[in-house]
Amino acid sequence: MKRITMFLTAAALVLAVSAPAVLASGGGGTRIALRSAQAFPAAKGAATFKAKPGERELEAEVEHVRRLAGKTVTFYVAGQKLGSAKVGALGAAHIARRNGAVPAVRAGTVVSVKTAGGVLIVKGSF
């Protein structure tokens, strides 16, 4: 009985020590949901931010906007234009940027996607 208790205690200690190391090495980053605006009630999206020493990466996507197929949408982070992407035939657009192209992201940083005419599609914050 004591062996099992010692083994379980040791295993728990190893997990407790290794989990923060995995998270500190970048892990999966921070992912947020982008919620639909009134003009596009079926739309949804997501954004993921990953940061390591000397490296930043931001990915964002919008889905369920089939009526915008073939049109260009613009992605914004903290009010800054991150870039544009064309909506595919299935109603989705995706963008990914690294390092210098990624503005500073902190708690409360807003990510939004708008049409070429400036109509809000989805929005969310870290």
PLM-predicted stretches and their roles:
Residues 2-7, 14-15, 19-126:
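N-terminal targeting/export leaders
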